[in-house]
Amino acid sequence: MPRVKRGFKARQRRNKVLKLAKGYRGARSKLFRSATEAVDRALNYAFRDRRVKKRDFRALWITRINAAARINGISYSKLIHGLKQAKVEVDRKVMADLAVSDPRGFAEIVSLAKANA
């Protein structure tokens, strides 16, 4: 089999990895092999955590809504059930924001849910 000289493409590939590893500590930003491992791991964590972030924020919104709902005398599950019955389509992100920034507006939504629960 003939020898393959990769020319500038090999350097391009290595430089791409080293550029991604910029700012890493020690050999991980200097040596190609160490940098490759570090970058692969970092990209895997980034991929995983983009999905985990969605779960974490949904849990945070639910916690905030539950706290505000209990101040208004209703549990989270009854609030959501009442809103579904009333055909109110407000997502959890908006409701959590309302609960924090506009308690009166949130109380109106709660009263709507209580009427239809």
UniProtKB/Swiss-Prot annotation:
Protein name as it appears in the record: Large ribosomal subunit protein bL20
Give the organism, scientific name. Geotalea daltonii (strain DSM 22248 / JCM 15807 / FRC-32)
List the GO cellular component terms: ribonucleoprotein complex; ribosome
- One matching Pfam family is Ribosomal_L20
Q: Which family does it belong to?
A: Belongs to the bacterial ribosomal protein bL20 family.
**Disulfide bridges in this chain:** none
Query: What Gene3D superfamilies does the entry give?
Result: 6.10.160.10, Ribosomal protein L20 (1.10.1900.20)
Q: Which GO terms describe its biological process?
A: ribosomal large subunit assembly; translation
Q: Cite the GO molecular-function annotations of the record.
A: rRNA binding; structural constituent of ribosome
Explain the purpose of this protein.
Binds directly to 23S ribosomal RNA and is necessary for the in vitro assembly process of the 50S ribosomal subunit. It is not involved in the protein synthesizing functions of that subunit.
Is the RNA-binding keyword given for this protein? yes
* Gene coding for it: rplT
Keywords from UniProt, A to Z, are:
Ribonucleoprotein, Ribosomal protein, RNA-binding, rRNA-binding
Give the matching InterPro entries.
Ribosomal_bL20, RIBOSOMAL_L20_CS, Ribosomal_protein_bL20_C
- Leader peptide range in chain numbering: none
Please give the SUPFAM superfamilies that the UniProt record associates with this protein: Ribosomal protein L20
